[in-house]
């Protein structure tokens, strides 16, 4: 094999590894209960593949705290992340209820309808409400 063939083979291997890393990223990771800020994150592999994920943690004061924490995780997997927006989530596991509302002052408002669809993949038996009201 010449150098170009070796380089091409190496790039294909790296791309396959980043595709596998992207496939392994959970769509939803949020706090088990309470009212907390959340962000939508678009995660990209080295090629054209991407997916939107939802992250929300009660221990994070700012939307940027959530994004920065998760961005570090994605970087270690060889993935790139962008945040198109955020908001708040009210999570009541006893009532099987989620409410998605508000916006992020730093990132803007996430697409709450898309957030609802993504949350429903992890919480199919929940009632999920969206609202553009509130902060």
Swiss-Prot record:
Tissue-specificity statement: Somatic and germline cells. Isoform B is expressed in both sexes and in somatic and germ line cells. Isoform A is expressed in males and is germ line specific.
Record-level Gene Ontology MF annotations: protein histidine phosphatase activity
Pfam families: Ocnus
Keywords (A to Z) from UniProt: Differentiation, Sexual differentiation
The keyword Oxidoreductase is annotated on this UniProt entry: no
CC per GO annotation: cytosol
Active site, UniProt feature: 63
Residues annotated to bind substrate: 37, 104-106
Keyword Nucleotidyltransferase attached: no
InterPro entries named in the record: Janus, Janus_sf
Taxonomic superkingdom: Eukaryota
GO biological process: cell differentiation; sex differentiation
Family: Belongs to the janus family.
Role: JanA and janB regulate somatic sex differentiation.
PANTHER family, per database record: BCDNA.GH02250-RELATED, JANUS-A/JANUS-B
Additional remarks: Transcription of janA gives rise to two sex-specific and one non-sex-specific transcripts.
Name of the protein described by the UniProt record: Sex-regulated protein janus-A
């Amino acid at each position: 094999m010449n150098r170009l063939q070796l380089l091409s083979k190496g790039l294909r291997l790296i791309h396959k590894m980043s595709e596998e890393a992207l496939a392994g990223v959970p769509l939803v990771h949020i706090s088990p209960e309470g009212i907390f800020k959340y962000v939508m994150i678009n995660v990209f592999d080295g090629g054209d593949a991407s997916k939107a994920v939802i992250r929300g943690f009660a221990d994070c004061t700012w939307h940027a705290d959530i994004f920065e924490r998760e961005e570090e995780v994605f970087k270690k997997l060889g993935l790139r992340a962008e945040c198109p927006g955020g908001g708040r989530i009210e999570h009541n596991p006893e009532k099987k209820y989620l409410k998605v509302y508000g916006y992020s002052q730093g990132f803007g408002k996430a697409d709450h309808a898309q957030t609802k669809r993504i949350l429903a993949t992890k919480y199919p038996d929940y009632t999920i409400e969206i609202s553009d009201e509130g902060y």
